[in-house]
Regions:
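A charged, aromatic-enriched C-terminal amphipathic alpha-helix characteristic of glycosyltransferases
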Residues: 364-398
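Membrane-proximal helix-turn-helix segments that form the acceptor-binding/catalytic region
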Residues: 25-26, 98-105, 139, 151-184
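A short, active-site helix/loop in glycosyltransferases that binds the activated sugar's phosphate group
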Residues: 50, 121-123, 167-202, 393
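Conserved acidic donor-binding segment of nucleotide-sugar-dependent glycosyltransferases
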Residues: 344-353, 361-366
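Short hydrophobic beta-strand element within catalytic cores of glycosyltransferases
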Residues: 317-320, 327-331
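N-terminal subdomain of nucleotide-sugar transferases
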Residues: 1-61, 252-257
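Acceptor-binding helix/loop patch of EC 2.4 sugar-transfer enzymes
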Residues: 73-87, 133-171
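Conserved catalytic-core segment of nucleotide-activated headgroup transferases in glycan assembly
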Residues: 206-279, 287-299
């Protein structure tokens, strides 16, 4: 089967200036009979050397596309305020030249795969083919959720951005092609449901997000002594800020119950003030702003605390932790769309009281939580395996 992938960004094994890892890992263990040619706008600006490396790793051919001249000038001159005047998001005004369309049609592909929610006009250029459009999230759902958070209203610029972008993405999603030959692929169940509500009758398919990297050999799950190693992975950005502040304020208030039980590590930027506050309170705490080998660093820990306040789709760092044997303790947004079960293969908390209860309980019932971490890892290997998800994606072309 021959597939042509048309993408905003060039795939790479890691996220490079965009979500480039998802298409890479959807292809790396694809069925042996699937041949893929990639046409990329290279919005993430991968170097020629890196592109050749990806071609070799994925056994694909990558051809670069030119961005519309006017968009290049908008980006070069920092004229992004122009987005406010547009009916749709800026990158929705991208399509292929007739010459490129003819070239792709000449390859006689069995299907056209489009990656990136904004380039839906490209999907419409191949009406005679079976098409799968990987979004992978619903941007309108993201802005809808953002407008429901209190912290957004405290920042005038953030509020205005969300107010401007929400209707643009709603309009864009409402005019996605809705025909039997186009299937939309999302990595969020709520995202797929949201798209069906915005565009009734559209074929929106939820597929689990593939996990990325697993340490070899696999980590033996045995919590550290005398202190359990607790990891907080990711930047202290707007996705985590609200829930993280609530969680660590609780830990500061309950310092006598927790400080002798945990060694806390922040892996990411923006946590400096929190590190200082926890240290001053008596916690054993460290910060690593950059790890040369991210997975190796993750594997040094036992529990990952993921206090995510907002977001859509699937959280890659949660998948990384689960796949590498950590017990994940997180909010509903942290664990949504992941094939784990609260109290069986992860711990989901909805309040500071629930978080405190589990953090107090873990040191007293270590074996119970080690088994939970093992079940979490098993669930990810089965339900989020790259080979499995790639096969499911390719099967969409056959339906």
């Amino acid at each position: 089967m021959r597939i042509v992938l048309i993408t905003q960004i060039t795939p790479a094994s890691e996220n490079v200036r965009g979500t480039s890892a998802l298409p890479y890992h959807l292809m790396v263990h694809r069925p042996a009979d699937v041949d893929i040619v990639i046409y990329s706008f290279n919005g993430n600006q991968l170097s020629d050397a890196k592109i050749k490396e990806v071609e070799k790793e994925l056994n694909v051919t990558i051809k670069l596309l030119s961005r519309p001249t006017w968009q290049s000038w908008v980006l070069r001159l920092h004229l992004l305020f122009i987005r406010v005047l547009l009916k749709y998001p800026l990158f929705n005004y991208m399509w292929l030249s007739s010459k490129v369309v003819e070239e792709i049609e000449g390859l006689q592909p069995d299907g056209i795969w489009v990656y990136g929610q904004d380039i839906s006009r490209v999907t419409k250029q191949f009406g005679g083919f079976k098409r799968v459009h990987t979004l992978p999230d619903s941007e309108s759902l993201y802005y809808y959720r953002m407008l429901g958070r209190r912290f957004v209203f405290k920042n005038w610029m953030m509020f205005m951005r969300n107010m401007v972008m929400y209707p643009k993405y709603l309009r864009m999603e409402s005019v996605y092609e809705n025909s039997p030959t186009v299937k939309y692929h999302l990595v969020g169940e709520s995202d797929a449901e949201s798209l069906r509500n915005v565009n009734p009758g559209i074929q929106a398919n939820f597929l689990r997000h593939p996990h990325y990297h697993v340490a070899e050999p696999q980590k033996r799950i045995a919590f550290s002594k005398p202190k359990i190693r607790l990891l907080v992975a990711g930047q202290n950005n707007l996705y985590m800020k609200e829930a993280a502040e609530e969680a660590f304020d609780m830990m500061l208030h309950e310092v006598d119950k927790l400080k002798e039980c945990y060694k806390v590590t922040f892996l990411g930027r923006g946590w400096e003030s929190m590190v200082t506050r926890l240290k001053n309170a008596g916690y054993d705490v460290a910060q690593i702003t950059f790890a040369p080998d991210y997975i190796e660093e993750v594997c040094r820990h036992d529990v990952q605390l993921t206090p995510i306040a907002i977001g859509t789709g699937t959280k890659g760092k949660v998948l990384d932790a689960l796949a590498n044997g950590l017990l994940v303790v997180g909010t509903p947004f942290a664990l949504e769309n992941i094939a784990v079960e609260n109290g069986v293969s992860c711990v989901e908390y909805r309040s500071n009281e629930e978080l405190l209860s589990v953090l107090v309980d873990i040191p007293h019932n270590v074996q119970k939580y080690e088994q939970m971490a093992e079940k979490g890892r098993e669930a990810i290997f089965v339900e989020h395996g790259r080979r499995r998800i790639s096969q499911q994606l390719m099967d969409l072309f056959k339906q």
